[in-house]
C-alpha cells in the first residue's frame, strides 16, 4: 500500500474486517480483477461453485460487468439485491480483496466480520473453505429471501444524538425501535 503516513511500529497488529450484506454494488472489485491475478482467480473459483448452485449462472456474469446500458445496469442491480445472489457475491468480493492484499504481503493478525462478513472472516482464517462458505451463504440468502411477511417494515439511518432519537421513538405509535446505536453523534 502507498501512504504518506509513517510505518506502523513492529508491535502493531492488523485486523481485516468484512462487511455484511448492504454494501454490495454492480462492479465491486472489477477494478481489482482487471489489474491483479488473485481476485480474478477468486471470482473464477466462485463461478465454478455457483454455476452448480445457481443452475448455470455465474456471479461474475452480472457483478463484474462494466459499460452497461441503463437497462442492463438496472437488471444487474435488481439481481444483486436478491439475497440468494447478494450473499455469495459479497462473500466473493470480500475474499477477492483479501487475496489481493495477501498477494502483496498484507496478512491480518486478526479477522472480524459483521453478519455475512463472519463467513469471510472464517474463510480468511482458514476455518471454512470457499466452496463450503459460498454454498452456505447461498443457502442462507435463499432462506432469507423466502421469508414472507405482510408488513416488511422500513429502516432508516439517522445521524442524530441518541437522546433525540429515543424521544422521537417514544412519541411514535406502533412498533419502532433503534436497532443500532452507532451514530457519531
Predicted regions, residues:
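FabD-like malonyl-/acyl-CoA
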Residues: 4-171
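Gly/Ser-centered flexible loop/linker motifs
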Residues: 165-183
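Conserved alpha/beta-domain cores
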Residues: 2-4, 177-178
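Short, surface-exposed beta-edge/turn micro-motifs
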Residues: 153, 184-185
Amino acid at each position: 500500500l502507498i501512504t504518506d503516513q509513517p510505518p506502523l511500529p513492529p508491535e502493531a497488529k492488523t485486523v481485516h474486517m468484512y462487511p455484511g450484506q448492504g454494501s454490495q454494488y454492480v462492479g465491486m472489485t472489477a477494478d481489482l480483477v482487471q489489474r491483479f491475478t488473485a481476485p480474478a482467480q477468486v471470482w473464477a473459483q466462485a463461478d465454478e461453485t455457483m454455476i452448480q448452485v445457481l443452475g448455470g449462472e455465474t456471479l461474475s456474469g452480472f457483478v463484474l460487468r462494466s459499460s452497461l446500458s441503463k437497462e442492463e445496469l438496472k437488471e444487474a442491480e435488481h439481481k444483486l439485491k436478491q439475497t440468494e445472489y447478494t450473499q455469495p457475491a459479497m462473500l466473493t468480493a470480500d475474499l477477492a480483496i483479501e487475496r489481493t492484499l495477501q498477494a502483496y504481503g498484507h496478512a491480518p493478525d486478526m479477522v472480524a466480520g459483521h453478519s455475512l462478513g463472519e463467513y469471510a472472516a472464517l474463510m480468511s482464517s482458514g476455518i471454512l473453505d470457499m466452496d463450503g462458505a459460498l454454498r452456505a451463504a447461498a443457502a442462507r440468502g435463499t432462506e432469507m429471501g423466502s421469508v414472507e411477511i405482510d408488513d416488511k417494515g422500513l429502516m432508516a439511518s439517522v445521524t442524530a444524538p441518541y437522546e433525540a432519537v429515543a424521544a422521537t421513538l417514544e412519541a411514535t405509535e406502533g412498533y419502532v425501535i433503534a436497532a443500532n446505536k452507532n451514530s457519531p453523534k
